[in-house]
């Protein structure tokens, strides 16, 4: 029989009414001030309630909790656990490890709950070295047989890909807990081992919503669409998380139209969307260019906001609306939404600048100039957008200026995507020799996208010699892209060199290459695919001369 568990003894405890009514940081600070005035800061029990509220129950108060924690000379382990738990559960759990180090420096001994929180943070961040170090501490402190700690270890090792260690921990005692089953299933699915994940899922004695959602999400991440759909149809107790897994999974796998179809099923089933649903749907509309559905979603957001203090009015939703309108070509609407956002952050500016780059390049550059006037500090994404705008509007001199500005004024080191945008800009303008010299002078190794972009420009302007050189560079990097051969063949054909066309076709047949899968910033017809590459988090190319 699988037992239900909680991760902390304080999870369901009854709290004094004063703290139950503390719902915002302003009230929290008022209570803190009253405690100081009345000399209660030496009472660890009362201070613990304050720290608990700041860490776990008051939205946006975690930094305040850290500040309070720093001011307590001798916290007990319970107070430390409140702060660790809050940090581990937050969107940015990086501070959890340093908080644990501070706890040790103050001479506070950890308990079994302490390690569940730090291991959760290491799992979320996939910090293998830190997690292994904490595994060692667990052994030294004698908590390795504790059921909660063991589940946390299984979660950490499974999520970080150490499935052998996770399997060793997944013994009879661990199998009594559904958390351990879900962790193992998710770990195998995340690493693409769907058959093993499915085997565990089928063996699972009790499948709750979490287990079903984990398995469906795992299949979608591995692009096992049929398996995901089969599981989804079998599951009879779907919640909003289940629907979101399917909708976002289909969008991420390149099936935005099907994602909208699943949303219709969701509404027909009587399930109401949440913020995750809306974000995924707006992304689907942006990919499809489905302006009408995007407008209906916008109306739904506004109607929801008018009747309640809804989560839909947060910055991520406004950013997604701006992105959707810009990518659907509704520039005025995108700017209108942007102007209406009261709490703009850098991502709001970037969303508009990047979104306008393809369809309204002048507007993108104007927004960047406005951003500078308002002293909003740009980042790497900002400059991808503004250089791309210069590329699509033929503003080569301005593009050069912004590339230099990025390094000289803002101390942002260009990455491979900035270099790719510059090559794209010079290539579109027909300045092929300068584009070539720019590639040769790059401080990091050019990747296939850079060379393919130069090759695409050579095709447009009929530069056979430079095209051959770019193609040789591409083939030396990988020999399985037929698109590279097609581009070179087209260069020969455009200049009437039919013997060259025949040579390329023979090379193509001899190497038996695959169909094209790469991207050329110039040749790529689908601008949205290009944007997904530029804004993806793909690993950077190596620095020249660097040994890895």
UniProtKB/Swiss-Prot annotation:
GO terms (BP aspect): RNA modification
Chain segments annotated as transmembrane: none
Disulfide pairings: none
Family to which this protein belongs: Belongs to the PPR family. PCMP-E subfamily.
PROSITE patterns: PPR (PS51375)
Identification of the protein by name: Pentatricopeptide repeat-containing protein At5g15300
InterPro entries: E_motif, Pentatricopeptide_rpt, PPR_At4g14850-like_plant, TPR-like_helical_dom_sf
Gene Ontology MF annotations: RNA binding
Native source species: Arabidopsis thaliana (Mouse-ear cress)
Type E motif, as annotated region: 450-525
Domain of life assignment: Eukaryota
Pfam family, any one: PPR
Sequence ranges of the PPR repeats: 76-110, 111-145, 146-176, 177-211, 212-238, 239-273, 274-308, 314-348, 349-378, 379-409, 415-445
Keyword Isomerase belongs to the record: no
Keywords associated with the record: Repeat
Species classification: Eukaryota, Viridiplantae, Streptophyta, Embryophyta, Tracheophyta
Keyword Repeat in record: yes
């Amino acid at each position: 029989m699988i037992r239900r568990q909680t991760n902390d003894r304080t999870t369901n405890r009854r709290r004094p009414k004063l703290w139950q009514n503390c719902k915002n940081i302003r009230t929290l600070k008022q209570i803190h001030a009253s405690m100081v005035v009345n000399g209660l800061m030496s009472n660890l029990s009362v201070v613990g309630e304050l720290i608990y509220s700041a860490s776990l129950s008051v939205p946006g108060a975690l930094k305040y909790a850290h500040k309070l924690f720093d001011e307590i000379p001798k916290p007990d382990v319970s107070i430390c656990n409140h702060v660790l738990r809050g940090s581990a559960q937050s969107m940015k759990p990086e501070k959890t490890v340093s908080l644990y180090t501070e706890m040790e420096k103050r001479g506070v001994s950890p308990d079994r709950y302490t390690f569940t929180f730090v291991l959760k943070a290491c799992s979320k961040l996939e910090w293998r070295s830190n997690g292994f170090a904490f595994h060692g501490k667990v052994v030294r402190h004698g908590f390795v047989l504790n059921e909660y700690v063991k589940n946390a270890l299984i979660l950490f090792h499974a999520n970080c890909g150490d499935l052998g260690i996770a399997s060793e921990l997944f013994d009879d005692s661990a199998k009594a807990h559904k958390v351990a089953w879900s962790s193992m299933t998710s770990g195998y699915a995340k690493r693409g081992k769907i058959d093993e994940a499915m085997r565990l899922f089928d063996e699972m004695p009790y499948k709750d919503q979490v287990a079903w959602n984990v398995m469906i999400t795992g299949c979608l991440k591995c692009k096992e669409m049929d398996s995901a759909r089969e599981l989804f149809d079998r599951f009879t107790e779907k919640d909003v998380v289940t629907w979101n897994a399917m909708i976002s999974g289909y969008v991420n796998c390149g099936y935005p139209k099907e994602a909208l179809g699943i949303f219709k099923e969701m509404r027909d089933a009587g399930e109401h969307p949440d913020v995750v649903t809306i974000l995924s749907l707006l992304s689907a509309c942006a990919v499809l260019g489905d302006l009408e559905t995007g407008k209906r979603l916008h109306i739904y957001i506004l109607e929801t906001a008018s009747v309640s203090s809804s989560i839909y009015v947060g910055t991520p939703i406004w950013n997604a609306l701006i992105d959707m309108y810009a990518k659907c070509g509704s520039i005025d609407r995108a700017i209108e939404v942007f102007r209406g956002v009261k709490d703009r952050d850098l991502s709001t500016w970037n969303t508009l600048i990047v979104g306008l780059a393809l369809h309204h390049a002048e507007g993108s550059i104007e927004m960047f100039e406005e951003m500078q006037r308002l002293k909003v500090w740009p980042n790497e994404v900002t400059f991808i957008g503004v250089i791309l705008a210069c590329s699509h509007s033929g503003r080569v001199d301005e593009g050069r200026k912004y590339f230099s500005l990025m390094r000289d004024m803002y101390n942002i080191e260009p990455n491979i995507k900035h270099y790719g945008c510059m090559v794209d800009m010079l290539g579109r303008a027909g300045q092929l020799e300068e584009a070539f010299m720019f590639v040769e002078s790059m401080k990091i190794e050019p990747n296939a996208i850079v060379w393919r972009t130069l090759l695409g420009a050579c095709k447009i302007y009929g530069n056979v010699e430079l095209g051959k050189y770019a193609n040789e560079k591409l083939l030396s990097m990988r020999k399985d892209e037929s698109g590279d051969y097609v581009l070179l063949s087209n260069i020969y054909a455009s200049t009437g060199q039919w013997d060259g066309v025949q040579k390329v076709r023979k090379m193509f047949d001899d190497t038996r290459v695959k169909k094209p899968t790469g991207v050329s910033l110039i040749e790529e017809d689908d601008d949205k695919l290009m944007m997904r590459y530029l804004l993806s988090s793909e690993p950077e190319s190596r620095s020249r001369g660097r040994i890895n």
